[in-house]
């Protein structure tokens, strides 16, 4: 579905005259791409404006959000700010800066906004239809990546960095300023795409003096990171409504313990005394704390088991009181004990918590729970969209509630939307932004449907099918089977700028997206089955989906493509598919499980999913094996290649590299050299193996990219190589 044209006409007419007062040299604006044949291309994908981070004004009447635009020739994107009424009318662009603006936040009086630009915090007055002159209000030499204003905006918490555990040559000898090296004596020396030469820290400062001299480090002398790397931001901290307390999530571990443990605790920092009160410090990930409206309750997302990064995401609730002037935890309870899926992105509204979750329909929905754990789904089960957590909730007439959120589907990227509900029943939804309608209306639209297939063990597997525009079942089409990353994730109504299924369909391919074992929308048993069984049932699920597609009378050739765990799946299926697939594409995949164990950074993932399945345990000071087959160097390593656990033994024995003598199908291997999650040598090894077996193969390595391909021209090259390979072997 594409929304009606009315919103686009308002927006485009406005942008021609309702402009901010100044356009900086180097500004990147909306694309004016013209499409004559209705076919989406990789250039079209890069032309879309990308909406993010909507923020409602204090009076609830306006919404401020950012949009990123891309300039392929300049090889960069730039994010600027837009403002509209809460219903989407009177849209105007209020910044046209040459460098990106992020983390835009309203002042409590609604008359100005704060934001980050070039690593510092700025403030600008908002008057009428334009943004006034911005003024830098921070001076932090190490830069600021995120922040949160206190409720009264007299103070601010901000995120910056301090020197990390990894040393460089000048730490050894200041005269060695031309030497290049990284020096470490412990694990966790690199993370995601960077060497840990810096550690993020969170500070509190008065709004009038945002500088090191007037800032207080929340962690004091503790040697930990806050927020948690690599993706944590200010959402991991929350001011209490009275501004006296800050709740935060922190993994209070370093080195080997950090590398093997997922234990992130919840803490409360008292700003007056500088005292930290632990709320919950056991188990796995505890993240995203949010206070209720009067500061008497704190909710957060919690995983029960330490070492399992894909454990069920529960909603925990703590009752908070005051004793001797400090916050005290009275009780903690779970609100989702009877909910068999993951909860995400909590938002309070009165005595209810709204959240999002993947559902058995293969879509993401908005739900709510009361304080007794009674959960109801608010978005209609028949709506084939992914809805995200609300950014604003407003009581409406006749007892109804309007939920302002974001959504997308396979056919369009993120837009702002209002969902109206009454009690537990959905009433309607209305799209309130139309950022990309001028592009979408030029494109022919694919169609999608949900199907269910019977698996080899008699269960039902939900799959999405996406058909090219003007699909004609009397004709023959090439097809693509998507093998999912994660491995814990879901093929949903997802619109991605890296793996865009609509783009695949618009190149004339039928796209099959099976939700095999390990996906997250179908309950814990379905999700957890994959841990310790990488070579097993989920591979049979993929073969079931592939055989179904290949049997369709309108399907000719079939490709199999995937990234990360999907790349592992490609390498595995290459060795056992027979003649089902006509070509393969792997991006950032695991090829050699043993090599992966010794080179990845987040050891908890490999430890658990290779068959460890026991909680984190560590005894410092031990050297070598304990003799129990799972403990080495004092660390429980039941998923290691030298462990004796049956699942680990099987995983390494059946690693994709052990099946290369069966390889015979053309394969393309992508990898980024800055990928420290699945190091790029995995891609080199897979390509080398294909070459040694005489298999038609190609290798594309990106020296500056991580697990994802981000830079515009690299993205364009990736897509050109991707479709060139598909077309060569499937058309």
Question: Which residues are covered by each model-predicted region?
Answer:
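Short loop/turn segments that connect beta-strands within beta-propeller blades
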Residues: 85-89, 125-130, 207-211, 270-274, ...
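Cap/lid segment of the alpha/beta-hydrolase catalytic domain
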Residues: 433-557, 563-564, 598
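Predominantly five- to eight-bladed beta-propeller fold
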Residues: 21-28, 78-79, 161-215, 219-220, ...
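Active-site-proximal cap/loop segments of hydrolase catalytic domains
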Residues: 513-731
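Hydrophobic or amphipathic alpha-helical targeting/insertion segments
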Residues: 112-169
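Beta-strand-rich domains and repeat architectures in extracellular enzymes and scaffolds
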Residues: 43-79
